[in-house]
A protein has these predicted regions:
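An N-terminally biased module of ancient metal coordination in phosphate/nucleic-acid-related enzymes
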Residues: 1-87, 92, 96-97, 159-162, ...
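Domain-core and long-helix interface of multi-subunit machines
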Residues: 13, 99-102, 106-190
Length: 190
């Protein structure tokens, strides 16, 4: 089986792709399955006064269910979500997952202490090592708080946005905390 379970569409604030175009591309690449996992981050700070990373779940499900039916003989289509995790919104996230019939849930950490590492403000006032450690500490809190996800997404998200391109990321600097993260993730899957 060849598939992709981390696919964003126009339903995510960071993507403009039409779901049907992505389905056609997946078929052309020989994929058997595709799972749409658009972003929902309830605690993402508004941009220019606009709430982002929220979806209209009814429209999302209706659109993807219709496409699933149209392409059922060519590719298996699943409806999932990439959910931004944070202990302060655990109840809201859990309720959201339970009230929707997602086939697959990616848990991710995008917001750490109110900031996304994508933005320069996240990095201000701390060393790169301190900032990266705060990211892993947030993930550890999330994996010990949450159970309503199938896989944890892009643990290396922070590495994309390290502002100093000369910085050498040394995995052993974060060995202990990443070891605890992995043990919690593995325990959850048992």
């Amino acid at each position: 089986m060849i598939g992709d379970y981390h696919v964003h569409t126009k339903f995510s604030s960071d993507c403009n792709s039409e779901p049907e175009e992505l389905i056609k591309k997946a078929i052309s690449l020989g994929m058997n399955e595709i799972c749409f996992t658009d972003h929902v981050d309830f605690d993402y700070p508004p941009e220019n006064g606009q709430t982002i990373f929220r979806i209209n779940t009814k429209e999302y499900f209706n659109t993807l269910a219709a496409l699933r039916d149209s392409y059922k003989n060519r590719i298996k289509i699943k409806i999932g979500i990439e959910l931004g995790l944070n202990p302060s919104i655990e109840e809201m996230n859990s309720s959201f997952v339970k009230s929707n019939d997602f086939d697959f849930v990616i848990g991710s950490s995008h917001i750490i202490n109110g900031n996304d590492p994508y933005y320069p403000e996240f990095w201000e006032g701390k060393s790169i090592k301190e900032a990266v450690m705060s990211y892993f500490e947030a993930i550890l809190r999330n994996v010990t708080t949450y159970e309503n996800y199938d896989v944890y997404g892009h643990l290396d998200y922070i590495r994309r946005y390290i502002p100093d391109k000369e910085y050498v990321y040394v995995e052993n600097d974060f060995y202990e905390i990443t070891e605890m993260i992995f043990k919690n993730i593995i325990f959850l899957s048992l």
